[in-house]
Amino acid sequence: MRVKTGVVRRRRHKKVLKLARGFYSGRRKHFRKAKEQLERSMYYAFRDRKQKKREFRSLWVVRINAACRMHNTSYSRFMHALKVANIELDRKVLADMAMNDMQAFTSVLESVKEHL
C-alpha cells in the first residue's frame, strides 16, 4: 500500500514557514523560496556569531588606543605595560572605562606608567 506524505509534509512545511515569518514577499509565503532563504539566513547567523566576536574586539582596541593617544602613549605599549605590571583587566573592561569613566582609565594608566 502506498503511503502519502500528507501529515508529515504539512508539518514540515508549517515548521519552515513559521521560521520564515518576517521575510519579504514570496520568501515568507512559498515553501521552496522560504526554505532556500532560511538555509541562507541560518548560514549568515552561524557565520556572524563568529564575526561578532572579532568585530567587538577590534572596536575595543580602537577605543583603548584613542584613550591612550590622549595620554601620549600607544595601545601596544599600554597593553605591554599592563602585562608587566600584572594587571589583568580585559579589553572589554578597559574600553568601557575609556568611554564612560575616563578618570578610572587615567588612574590605571598612571599605575602602569613606570612600566612604559
From Swiss-Prot:
Domain of life: Bacteria
Disulphide connectivity of cysteines: none
CDD domains: Ribosomal_L20
Gene Ontology MF: a single term: structural constituent of ribosome
GO biological process, one term: ribosomal large subunit assembly
Keyword entries, A-Z: Ribonucleoprotein, Ribosomal protein, RNA-binding, rRNA-binding
Pfam family, any one: Ribosomal_L20
HAMAP family, alphabetized: Ribosomal_bL20 (MF_00382)
Stated role: Binds directly to 23S ribosomal RNA and is necessary for the in vitro assembly process of the 50S ribosomal subunit. It is not involved in the protein synthesizing functions of that subunit.
Family according to the record: Belongs to the bacterial ribosomal protein bL20 family.
Protein known as: Large ribosomal subunit protein bL20
Gene: rplT
